[in-house]
Amino acid sequence: MSPPRPGEKLPAVPLGPLDAAAIERYARASGDDNPVHLDPATARAIGLSDQIAHGMLVMGRLSRLALGWRADAVLESFECRFTRPVPAGSALTGDGRVAKVDALNDGHRVILRLLARDADGAIAAMGEATLRLPG
């Protein structure tokens, strides 16, 4: 398989919806039972529209875009910045592009820039994944 080129777009991938049940499952698995994630009344009391998804849950969903991009890719690192709360019920979509490709002796190192967008197209999270490709 040929190496990707900088600027190459990744196909958009659905990352949600992130409903209350998914948020509750994540809270149990992670041990993060902050009421802002689990109790709509608490979230509204601090000015949010509803309970919100955990940032790491959003990050995990966004990482699917990098992990599913090429079967031969090995993830070296993944960073994420959260730009807005993600209320329960949000339907996120991930998209991205190849930002950089470096040739190595045994393959290529690729940096992907990734975005998680809500149904209105607003960016909820921005990620950067570094992947290693063989050959």
Language-model features, listed with the residues they occupy:
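A generic structural signal for short beta-strands and their flanking turns/coil linkers
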Residues: 14, 22, 32-34, 74-78, ...
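Hydrophobic beta-strand-centered segment that forms part of the acyl-chain substrate-binding groove
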Residues: 44-53, 57-98
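HotDog/MaoC-like acyl-thioester-processing domains
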Residues: 1-12, 85-135
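Catalytic strand-loop segment that frames the active site of acyl-thioester-processing enzymes
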Residues: 1-51
